[in-house]
Protein backbone atom coordinates (compact mmCIF):
# COMPACT_ATOMS: atom_id res chain seq x y z
CA UNK A 1 0.00 0.00 0.00
CA UNK A 2 2.86 2.41 0.77
CA UNK A 3 4.22 1.79 -2.71
CA UNK A 4 0.91 2.95 -4.18
CA UNK A 5 0.82 6.01 -1.94
CA UNK A 6 4.41 6.90 -2.82
CA UNK A 7 3.65 6.55 -6.52
CA UNK A 8 0.52 8.68 -6.18
CA UNK A 9 2.48 11.34 -4.30
CA UNK A 10 5.12 11.48 -7.05
CA UNK A 11 2.54 11.77 -9.80
CA UNK A 12 0.40 14.32 -7.95
CA UNK A 13 3.55 16.43 -7.55
CA UNK A 14 4.62 15.95 -11.18
CA UNK A 15 1.36 16.18 -13.12
CA UNK A 16 -1.23 17.28 -10.56
CA UNK A 17 -4.24 15.46 -9.23
CA UNK A 18 -6.21 15.67 -12.49
CA UNK A 19 -3.26 14.43 -14.55
CA UNK A 20 -2.56 11.43 -12.33
CA UNK A 21 -4.85 8.63 -13.46
CA UNK A 22 -5.25 5.43 -11.48
CA UNK A 23 -3.65 3.55 -14.39
CA UNK A 24 -0.62 5.86 -14.29
CA UNK A 25 -0.37 5.48 -10.50
CA UNK A 26 -0.50 1.68 -10.74
CA UNK A 27 2.15 1.73 -13.48
CA UNK A 28 4.37 4.10 -11.44
CA UNK A 29 4.03 1.75 -8.44
CA UNK A 30 4.80 -1.30 -10.58
CA UNK A 31 1.53 -3.04 -9.75
CA UNK A 32 -1.55 -4.02 -11.69
CA UNK A 33 -4.57 -1.75 -11.74
CA UNK A 34 -6.45 -4.53 -9.94
CA UNK A 35 -3.99 -4.33 -7.06
CA UNK A 36 -4.55 -0.59 -6.82
CA UNK A 37 -8.33 -1.03 -6.74
CA UNK A 38 -7.97 -3.70 -4.08
CA UNK A 39 -6.79 -0.98 -1.67
CA UNK A 40 -8.27 2.18 -3.14
CA UNK A 41 -11.60 2.42 -4.96
CA UNK A 42 -10.56 5.59 -6.79
CA UNK A 43 -8.07 8.43 -7.02
CA UNK A 44 -9.93 10.43 -4.36
CA UNK A 45 -9.33 7.61 -1.85
CA UNK A 46 -5.61 7.74 -2.68
CA UNK A 47 -5.61 11.49 -2.14
CA UNK A 48 -7.35 11.07 1.21
CA UNK A 49 -4.93 8.35 2.34
CA UNK A 50 -1.95 10.49 1.32
CA UNK A 51 -3.31 13.47 3.22
CA UNK A 52 -3.92 11.33 6.31
CA UNK A 53 -0.36 10.00 6.12
CA UNK A 54 1.03 13.51 5.80
CA UNK A 55 -1.06 14.85 8.68
CA UNK A 56 0.20 11.98 10.88
CA UNK A 57 3.78 12.88 9.95
CA UNK A 58 3.12 16.54 10.68
CA UNK A 59 1.65 15.75 14.11
CA UNK A 60 4.61 13.52 14.88
CA UNK A 61 6.99 16.31 13.90
CA UNK A 62 5.10 18.76 16.10
CA UNK A 63 5.51 16.40 19.04
CA UNK A 64 9.25 16.04 18.35
CA UNK A 65 9.99 19.75 17.96
CA UNK A 66 7.78 21.14 20.72
CA UNK A 67 9.67 19.67 23.64
CA UNK A 68 9.96 21.47 26.99
CA UNK A 69 13.56 22.48 26.30
CA UNK A 70 12.75 24.66 23.26
CA UNK A 71 11.96 27.63 25.49
CA UNK A 72 15.63 27.74 26.57
CA UNK A 73 17.05 27.85 23.05
CA UNK A 74 18.36 31.09 21.53
CA UNK A 75 15.86 32.36 18.95
CA UNK A 76 17.99 31.49 15.88
CA UNK A 77 18.42 27.91 17.15
CA UNK A 78 14.73 27.76 18.06
CA UNK A 79 13.78 28.76 14.52
CA UNK A 80 16.07 26.09 13.10
CA UNK A 81 14.45 23.54 15.39
CA UNK A 82 10.92 24.60 14.46
CA UNK A 83 11.34 25.20 10.73
CA UNK A 84 13.97 22.79 9.37
CA UNK A 85 12.17 19.48 10.01
CA UNK A 86 9.09 20.76 8.17
CA UNK A 87 11.18 22.01 5.26
CA UNK A 88 12.79 18.58 5.06
CA UNK A 89 9.40 16.84 5.08
CA UNK A 90 8.02 19.06 2.32
CA UNK A 91 11.20 18.68 0.29
CA UNK A 92 10.95 14.90 0.52
CA UNK A 93 7.38 14.96 -0.75
CA UNK A 94 6.43 18.09 -2.69
CA UNK A 95 2.94 16.67 -3.24
CA UNK A 96 2.12 17.50 0.39
CA UNK A 97 1.76 21.21 -0.30
CA UNK A 98 -0.51 20.36 -3.23
CA UNK A 99 -2.52 17.97 -1.07
CA UNK A 100 -3.04 20.34 1.82
CA UNK A 101 -3.22 23.68 0.04
CA UNK A 102 -4.40 22.84 -3.44
CA UNK A 103 -7.74 23.07 -5.14
CA UNK A 104 -8.10 19.28 -4.98
CA UNK A 105 -8.40 19.36 -1.21
CA UNK A 106 -11.59 17.75 0.05
CA UNK A 107 -13.65 19.19 2.88
CA UNK A 108 -12.37 16.44 5.22
CA UNK A 109 -8.75 17.22 4.38
CA UNK A 110 -9.38 20.95 4.73
CA UNK A 111 -10.98 20.37 8.15
CA UNK A 112 -8.07 18.22 9.32
CA UNK A 113 -5.61 20.85 8.07
CA UNK A 114 -7.49 23.61 9.92
CA UNK A 115 -7.41 21.49 13.07
CA UNK A 116 -3.66 20.97 12.68
CA UNK A 117 -3.18 24.70 12.09
CA UNK A 118 -5.12 25.47 15.28
CA UNK A 119 -2.94 23.03 17.23
CA UNK A 120 0.25 24.66 15.97
CA UNK A 121 -1.06 28.14 16.81
CA UNK A 122 -1.89 26.93 20.34
CA UNK A 123 1.58 25.46 20.78
CA UNK A 124 3.33 28.51 19.37
CA UNK A 125 1.24 30.91 21.47
CA UNK A 126 2.14 28.99 24.63
CA UNK A 127 5.81 29.01 23.64
CA UNK A 128 5.78 32.74 22.89
CA UNK A 129 4.18 33.49 26.26
CA UNK A 130 7.03 31.59 27.91
CA UNK A 131 9.61 33.49 25.87
CA UNK A 132 7.93 36.85 26.57
CA UNK A 133 6.10 36.60 29.91
CA UNK A 134 4.60 40.09 29.46
CA UNK A 135 2.84 39.00 26.27
CA UNK A 136 -0.92 38.78 26.72
CA UNK A 137 -2.81 35.76 25.40
CA UNK A 138 -4.47 37.55 22.46
CA UNK A 139 -1.19 39.03 21.22
CA UNK A 140 0.55 35.66 21.67
CA UNK A 141 -2.10 34.02 19.46
CA UNK A 142 -1.71 36.76 16.86
CA UNK A 143 2.09 36.37 16.81
CA UNK A 144 1.65 32.59 16.60
CA UNK A 145 -0.81 32.92 13.72
CA UNK A 146 1.46 35.28 11.78
CA UNK A 147 4.45 32.99 12.36
CA UNK A 148 2.54 29.87 11.34
CA UNK A 149 1.21 31.57 8.21
CA UNK A 150 4.70 32.59 7.15
CA UNK A 151 6.08 29.09 7.65
CA UNK A 152 3.10 27.59 5.82
CA UNK A 153 3.75 29.92 2.88
CA UNK A 154 7.39 28.87 2.98
CA UNK A 155 6.37 25.20 2.74
CA UNK A 156 4.42 25.91 -0.44
CA UNK A 157 7.41 27.77 -1.91
CA UNK A 158 9.83 25.03 -0.87
CA UNK A 159 7.68 22.38 -2.51
CA UNK A 160 7.70 24.23 -5.82
CA UNK A 161 11.43 25.11 -5.78
CA UNK A 162 13.43 22.36 -7.50
CA UNK A 163 16.81 24.03 -6.94
CA UNK A 164 18.38 23.17 -3.55
CA UNK A 165 20.21 26.51 -3.45
CA UNK A 166 16.96 28.33 -4.17
CA UNK A 167 15.20 26.39 -1.40
CA UNK A 168 18.00 27.17 1.04
CA UNK A 169 17.78 30.86 0.17
CA UNK A 170 14.00 30.89 0.70
CA UNK A 171 14.39 29.19 4.07
CA UNK A 172 17.20 31.51 5.17
CA UNK A 173 15.29 34.66 4.23
CA UNK A 174 12.12 33.46 5.93
CA UNK A 175 14.06 32.67 9.09
CA UNK A 176 15.67 36.14 9.02
CA UNK A 177 12.23 37.71 8.73
CA UNK A 178 10.81 35.57 11.54
CA UNK A 179 13.85 36.18 13.73
CA UNK A 180 13.50 39.96 13.44
CA UNK A 181 9.76 39.75 14.11
CA UNK A 182 10.02 37.37 17.05
CA UNK A 183 13.00 39.19 18.55
CA UNK A 184 10.93 42.39 18.60
CA UNK A 185 8.11 40.51 20.33
CA UNK A 186 10.42 38.92 22.90
CA UNK A 187 12.26 42.19 23.55
CA UNK A 188 9.06 44.20 23.81
CA UNK A 189 6.97 41.53 25.49
CA UNK A 190 3.89 42.80 23.67
Where do the PLM segments sit?
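Short hydrophobic clusters on alpha-helical segments that form packing/core surfaces
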Residues: 4, 8-12, 58, 86, ...
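Alpha-helical DNA-contacting segments of helix-turn-helix folds
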Residues: 47-54, 116
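Hydrophobic alpha-helical connector segments
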Residues: 49, 63-91
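Hydrophobic/aromatic-rich alpha-helical bundle segments in the mid-to-C-terminal region
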Residues: 97-102, 110, 130-177, 189-190
Amino acid sequence: MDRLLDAAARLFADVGYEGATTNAIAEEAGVSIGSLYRYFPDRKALLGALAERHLRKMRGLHDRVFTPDVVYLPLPVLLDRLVDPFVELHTECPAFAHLLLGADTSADIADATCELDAEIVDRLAALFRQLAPGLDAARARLVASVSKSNVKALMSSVASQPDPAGRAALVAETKKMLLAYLQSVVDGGR
